[in-house]
Amino acid sequence: MKRAVYAGSFDPVTNGHLWMIREAVELFDELIVAVGVNPDKHCTFSVDERVALLREVTSGFSKLRVDVFENQFLVNYAQSVGANYIVRGIRTASDYEYERTMRYINSDLHPDITTLFLLPPREYAEVSSTMVKGLIGPRGWEGVIRQYLPEPVYRKMLSMYSEQ
């Protein structure tokens, strides 16, 4: 069985993340979307909210499950869930440099786990959770962020930030 892990903070999940998930689901028998928890990182959404939003926007995928991992190398988590692949998105040259280094480290730790890089289409190449959150504030932000987020996430962002 070909099982893969696609990990991130998903704070919030974007249409770029969903593109990655759609592509990876087609490549593997099972995809585990793993929400990483970093206690040193301030997140907009709690881990429970991120998991719930991911489950909602991926409910149509039968070969997918959402999980959480904390305080361990991704490759060790992948090994613990029986995954033989790690899927990573490459949007920029700096993403590539970082992910290439991590791929070599992962290979040193678990040579049996392959890291696979996916390059998103142009319309998602600049989309990140950080970018979306950075657009919030100026008049009209609600219309601007809509194109980058799945509808349930967009509604959650509206309810969160419209109250402020």
Curated annotation (Swiss-Prot):
One GO MF annotation is: pantetheine-phosphate adenylyltransferase activity
The enzyme class is: transferase
EC number(s) reported in the record: 2.7.7.3
The answer to whether keyword Transcription regulation applies is no
Task: Give a GO biological-process term.
Answer: coenzyme A biosynthetic process
Q: Primary place of residence?
A: cytoplasm
Q: Name one Pfam family in it.
A: CTP_transf_like
Q: Detail which positions bind ATP.
A: S9, F10, H17, G89, I90, R91, E99, Y124, A125, E126, V127, S128, S129, T130
Which residues does the annotation say bind substrate?
A: S9, K41, L74, R88
Recorded GO CC terms? cytoplasm
InterPro entries per the UniProt record, alphabetical: Cyt_trans-like, PPAT, Rossmann-like_a/b/a_fold
Domain of life of the organism encoding this protein = Bacteria
So what does this thing catalyse? Answer: (R)-4'-phosphopantetheine + ATP + H(+) = 3'-dephospho-CoA + diphosphate
Which of UniProt's keywords are assigned here?
ATP-binding, Coenzyme A biosynthesis, Cytoplasm, Magnesium, Nucleotide-binding, Nucleotidyltransferase, Transferase
Q: Where, per UniProt, does this protein localize?
A: Cytoplasm
Q: Which cofactor does it need?
A: Mg(2+)
What pathway does this protein act in? Cofactor biosynthesis; coenzyme A biosynthesis; CoA from (R)-pantothenate: step 4/5
* Family according to the record: Belongs to the bacterial CoaD family.
Query: Which function does this protein serve?
Result: Reversibly transfers an adenylyl group from ATP to 4'-phosphopantetheine, yielding dephospho-CoA (dPCoA) and pyrophosphate.
Q: Which PANTHER family match?
A: PHOSPHOPANTETHEINE ADENYLYLTRANSFERASE
Q: What is this protein called?
A: Phosphopantetheine adenylyltransferase
Which species is this UniProt entry from?
Chromobacterium violaceum (strain ATCC 12472 / DSM 30191 / JCM 1249 / CCUG 213 / NBRC 12614 / NCIMB 9131 / NCTC 9757 / MK)
